[in-house]
Design a protein with these regions (language model features):
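Glycine-rich phosphate-binding loops of nucleotide-dependent enzymes
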Residues: 2-5, 14, 32, 37, ...
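N-terminal intrinsically disordered, low-complexity tails
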Residues: 10-45
Length: 358
């Protein structure tokens, strides 16, 4: 877990436990909220603010959720590097000599038409696929041959295009599960509930409560995941990913199925995550959202990088326009401002469901 304990409300903090003790709740309040393995019909709905009134202070929540600030790294330095990465499935080359980096403290958008290789690149970074050639370097060390849980421990967390939650567990329990990657307690320690295990569990619950408040679902901490709205399930998945204390948060189409108001709210959350000290990789089909929230965009087409730059640079690049509209550069030049059938059709990826290339 992070070494910082702002406000003294972590496992070893005095103020938070004093507040709970004064109301006669102390650790029992955590037990009421978090009972792994318990068979409950439908737990009572409890707002985080009822258990931890301190978390009504957004500055305190931001401090609890922020990554470990004892790590000294400059914003703008490469955090993850794709170095000449090729991923091949039999005769199909899904990624072809792909090179780009993700810099500390930025929101990077990864876009491209269906089948461009976005999901393959995403999976190569997070350990689902191993590169056929080249390497993925994260925080100075190659990670391409590591097992997925080791990559998570190194500091890469992800969400999924299709929501993957533990539906019969509460929102709080789902987030606490995410913190398991940072636990140091042995299996015997957990079985016999040693002081170290209890301390780590208290830490995990406290931070999970802060994360739920941070993403906007603090009022639903004890609701089962299956009972949450679609938008809240998306936010819960982000909270669970943040519970692993990542250096890099990878979001796979987080706005899929959202209405315009929900997308605006999501954009605010993604910026908030970046501003709190995280680095974010975003795959998303909604170009308005991508352009509005990212600091830089990398564009893939047929498994190759065709553009890398600021949102304004990328969206005005003739190669990118041609890739999205499906017309040659020469036709775009000859028909600038025109309204031919391809131009009227708009980007082929709007409303798409993901890469054709897995």
């Amino acid at each position: 877990m992070s070494t910082h304990d702002p406000g003294g409300i972590g496992a070893g903090g005095e103020h938070g436990d004093e507040h709970l003790a004064s109301s006669g709740r102390a650790d029992s309040s955590r037990a009421d909220l978090y009972m792994p393995g318990a068979v409950l019909e439908e737990p009572a709905i409890v707002d985080v603010a009822e258990v931890r009134p301190e978390l009504a202070n957004p500055d305190l929540v931001d401090a609890m959720v922020a990554p470990d600030r004892t790590v000294h790294a400059k914003v703008g330095e490469p955090l993850l590097q794709m170095q000449n990465v090729t991923v091949q499935f039999g005769g199909l080359v899904a990624l072809n000599d792909v090179t780009f980096d993700i810099r500390r403290g930025e929101i990077l958008g990864l876009i491209g038409p269906n089948g461009a290789g976005k999901t393959t690149a995403f999976n190569a970074m997070t350990g689902v696929y191993r590169p056929t050639q080249g390497q993925v370097v994260f925080d100075g060390s190659p990670v391409g041959k590591l097992k997925r849980y080791r990559i998570t421990q190194r500091g890469i967390a992800r969400t999924f295009q299709n929501i993957r939650l533990f539906n019969e567990m509460t929102a709080l329990e789902n987030v606490v599960v995410g913190s398991d990657a940072r636990h140091r307690t042995s299996v015997p320690g957990a079985l016999f509930r040693t002081p170290r295990h209890r301390r780590e569990e208290r830490d995990a619950i406290d931070r999970a409560l802060a994360l739920l408040e941070f993403v906007g679902v603090g009022g639903r901490a004890t609701e089962k995941a299956r009972n949450l709205s679609y938008g809240d399930q998306r936010r819960l998945e982000i909270a669970r990913a943040l519970a692993t204390e990542p250096k890099l948060l990878c979001l796979d189409e987080p706005a899929a199925g959202f209405n315009p108001a929900e997308k605006e709210s999501l954009m605010d959350l993604i910026r908030h995550i970046r501003d709190d000290g995280y680095t974010v990789l975003l795959i998303e089909h909604d170009m308005r959202l991508v352009r509005g929230v990212t600091d830089r965009i990398v564009v893939l087409e047929f498994g190759r990088v065709i553009a890398d730059g600021t949102p304004d640079e990328v969206t005005s690049d003739p190669k990118v326009i041609a890739a999205y509209l499906g017309v040659p550069d020469s036709e775009l030049t000859a028909d600038e401002g025109g309204t031919g059938p391809d131009r009227a059709a708009g980007p082929t990826t709007e409303g798409g469901s993901g890469d054709a290339t897995a």
